[in-house]
Regions:
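Soluble or luminal CAZymes and related metallo-dependent hydrolases
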Residues: 19-23, 52, 114-121, 149-157, ...
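Short, well-ordered alpha-helical microsegments
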Residues: 50, 76-78, 151, 219, ...
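Conserved alpha-helical substructure of the radical SAM core
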Residues: 1-91, 106-111, 117, 273-305
Length: 305
């Protein structure tokens, strides 16, 4: 469940911003110097709220990277959807928690932004447009098991959705977000705790907004949404990505992950849990620890020392 959910308090005030096109291009250009492969356009909120989203996609393509978006699909329909696909969008994932109307309303808590039925219609229309235009965009869904005692039951319902819509999917166990959300009712994950590998991997998260009027706050991963102020490692409005990566805050985080003395925003996160069955089912060519569109495996970085 997304920490932006009103039940968890959402993002901190200074992070309720949109990154300007120029700032975005400056950050993409900086990252491109270091071998940029994928830009995920959703790290600071619901991407489709940005009415200029196709322009951001065009910038990503200008620098030879893939453009990915994970979203609840709020405005991904009609001309806006077509413009995003035409701009070169490579991968779009609809977050869809809840295997029927009742479960969707409970877990997505998104009656204004969408519903089970409207999300179905958006996925279907986008998939059809990709087929009609022979676009390279992969349309995907993402589902969570809401009760670990009923995995097979929920899995079969999700599979029916995916098969009828003819899309790629990943179905995962429920996870928390750095301790923001209580998921005990779904069945707590069990396993040994170990670094998730993210502080060592070439995965950089740049947020719109920041602390004390600065912008481009860099976070260790996207899972710290909802604990925005605690997890800032630097700002691209002040330093380059390389300077932040090699800076004191990022270096300390890596030391903490080596020693197991995790900061509070990491300590309760399920991504530290070694649970080989967390990815319940997928029809996509995807490994548990392989980040979409990249050439690295997080498992390699979980063994960092």
């Amino acid at each position: 469940m997304c920490p932006q959910d009103v039940r968890t308090g959402g993002r901190h005030k200074d992070f309720l911003k949109k990154m300007s096109l120029q700032e975005f291009e400056d950050n993409v250009a900086d990252c491109a110097q270091h071998g940029l492969r994928v830009v995920n356009l959703d790290g600071s909120g619901e991407a489709t709220l940005n009415r200029n989203l196709p322009k951001y996609i065009e910038i990503v393509k200008k620098y030879g990277a893939k453009a990915f978006i994970f979203s609840n699909g709020y405005r991904m329909e009609g001309k806006f959807m077509r413009d995003c696909v035409d701009a070169g969008l490579d991968f779009y994932r609809f977050s869809w928690i809840g295997y029927d109307v009742e479960a969707y309303d409970k877990w997505m808590y998104n009656r204004i932004g969408g519903s089970f039925g409207s999300t179905w219609d958006k996925v279907k229309a986008m998939r059809q447009y990709v087929i009609d235009t022979n676009a390279d965009c992969v349309v995907s869904t993402y589902h969570l098991i809401t009760d670990n005692s009923k995995i097979e039951y929920e899995l079969e319902h999700y599979k029916r959705i995916v098969n009828e819509l003819d899309v790629k999917t990943e179905i995962w166990k429920m996870h928390n977000w750095s301790g923001v959300t209580d998921i005990s009712e779904t069945g707590v994950r069990q396993g040994a705790k170990k670094t998730c590998g993210r502080p060592f991997s070439p995965d950089v998260v740049i947020r719109a907004g920041g602390l004390d009027g600065q912008r481009g706050a860099v976070h260790p991963c996207c899972q710290v949404l909802g604990r925005d102020e605690e997890a800032v490692l630097g700002h691209t409005s002040k330093n380059t990505i390389e300077e932040i990566w090699e800076g004191e805050a990022y270096s300390k985080l890596r030391d903490d992950h080596r020693s197991g003395d995790y900061p509070s925003y990491c300590n309760d996160c399920d991504f530290l849990v070694d649970d080989p069955e967390v990815l319940v089912w997928t029809n996509h060519d995807r490994d548990l620890h392989h980040m979409h569109g990249t050439e690295f495996d997080l498992q390699d970085y979980r063994n960092a020392n």
